[in-house]
Amino acid sequence: MSFSSAVKNELCRVETDRSSSLFELAAAARISGLIKVVNANEINLRLVTENAAFARRIFSQIKDLYGINAEISIRRSPKLKKNIVYIIVLTSSKGLMRILEDINIKVSEKVEYIPYARCMRKKEYRKAYLRGAFLASGSMSDPEKTYHLEITCHNMALATEVSDLMDSFKLHSKVTKRKGNYVVYLKEGENIVDFLNIIGAHSALLELENIRILKEMRNNVNRIVNCETANLQKTVDASVRQVENINYIKEHLGFDKLPENLREIAKMRLAYSDATLKELGEMLNPPLGKSGVNHRLRKLDKIAESLRNMKGEL
């Protein structure tokens, strides 16, 4: 089961009062409902979902709120033949007009979605509307791979409505157009966690938080390993360069021409090419700190560079 399906199944177990049920139903019908004007006397509304729990929830809400038994049928998905889709149909002969009036959808020659200001009055109403919107038309990526949550709307006005509701909780949503639809989305993990909390998906929230913590730990470990690897590579490269320069000095100048302190560190570096600066310093008599060792080795680098310049090798 996908993470998105698990979230929806959890949301379908959230208990709601009559008002919250109405706002859930309103969101589902407004955002993903397909309204068809058959003729002057007949209108129908279709809700299509692949989630069986959501289909049962919508069917129950319609019956509890309006005493209507909606028609429900099961089909194979036209896109993915192995998937089942559930189709809930309401008609004007079975009380659809009353529902449309309650959820601010006006049907005459065309379908008009009137701004649904009622759901802005209380926080619980806004939560219920967002829960219904996600159940009807939302999806979420696998958080192991990336953080992305979206709700698809079939017009800009509805997308703006959903975005404004999200932003009333300071979620910083964005809207984009995709294949003729308008998608409201969240990209930040923290905002997605907050959204799941708002709509009541608390188990999914905890799972997402655990995934975020593990990903952050892995990223921190990788950063440390990469940093240590880079530092080790720098140390190795410096040691190789130092050994090459010291051998060049030995061959073209001779150690006897070097001051005692440089001769000592040159021999020590050749003898212990894989030693760190700290280890080299501790082997000297008297011991020398890292900066002192580094200073002497840099002097040897400069001597080698001068010799190469004199011989025209640079």
Curated annotation (Swiss-Prot):
InterPro entries: Homing_endonucl, Sporu_reg_WhiA_N_dom, Sporulation_regulator_WhiA, Sporulation_regulator_WhiA_C, WhiA_LAGLIDADG_dom. Gene3D superfamilies: Homing endonucleases (3.10.28.10). Pfam families: HTH_WhiA, LAGLIDADG_WhiA, WhiA_N. Transmembrane segments: none annotated. GO terms for biological process: cell division; regulation of sporulation. Residues 276-309 bind DNA. Involved in cell division and chromosome segregation. This is Probable cell division protein WhiA. It comes from Acetivibrio thermocellus (strain ATCC 27405 / DSM 1237 / JCM 9322 / NBRC 103400 / NCIMB 10682 / NRRL B-4536 / VPI 7372) (Clostridium thermocellum).
